[in-house]
Amino acid sequence: MIQYKEKFIKSFNIKESPSDFELNLFKKTQKYSRYISWIPWLKMLAVCNSLSMYSTKSTSDIDLFIVTEKNRIWFVRFFITIIFYIFWVWRKDESNSAWNFCLSFFACENNLDFSKIAIKNDIYLYYWIHYLKPIINKNWAHEKFIDSNLALWIKKDELPKDNKDYIISVKSYQLKAISYLFGFIDWFWYFLYQNIFKLLSPKTKKVQRPFWVIISREILKFHDKDKREEIRDRILD
């Protein structure tokens, strides 16, 4: 896939370094990521799509990809949504999308092999992973994600050198204390997950071809306008 890099860069107007506007968006992401970094079951938060590729527009939102602990995907999504809603930085719809956070892609740490949701010759998915910029990276979650996707021809030595320039520090002792504090809440949530969500999952699981929307116990993907096929055909033409 690396052979298509020049065409991909031209197609999306990707810059070698971020503009001042994009740097401010990264600073905003770092700021609000600190407000959620205490969540023990949050393993990685990364910027993806246009901002990670340095190809934003003045109306761009901030797309986030979030990795959670196994069986905690709905719990983490709930907390992040509430916190971002309180700070008024959650992208609810098109009317407030500019510069706000789009919480449209979550995955559990035990299901990071995206070859399962790739289309044939998935050029966009390759570069989506290639340019991913982690902000929160607990227990080497980003490295584990890359290792899980080597089947998609991802090569570590070809990743942009600045991919990890935006990672914020997370104090482990605070996470441990909060884990104890939230022990009961976690137990109660896991009880609901095991006894209620699993019963409902056959009815709630939803996958639209070609993986535009995925709602399951391990992946939540809410992009209802997936253009990967269109992008692939344009670049391969």
Where are these regions (language model features)?
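Catalytic core of pol beta-like nucleotidyltransferases
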Residues: 1-59, 68-237
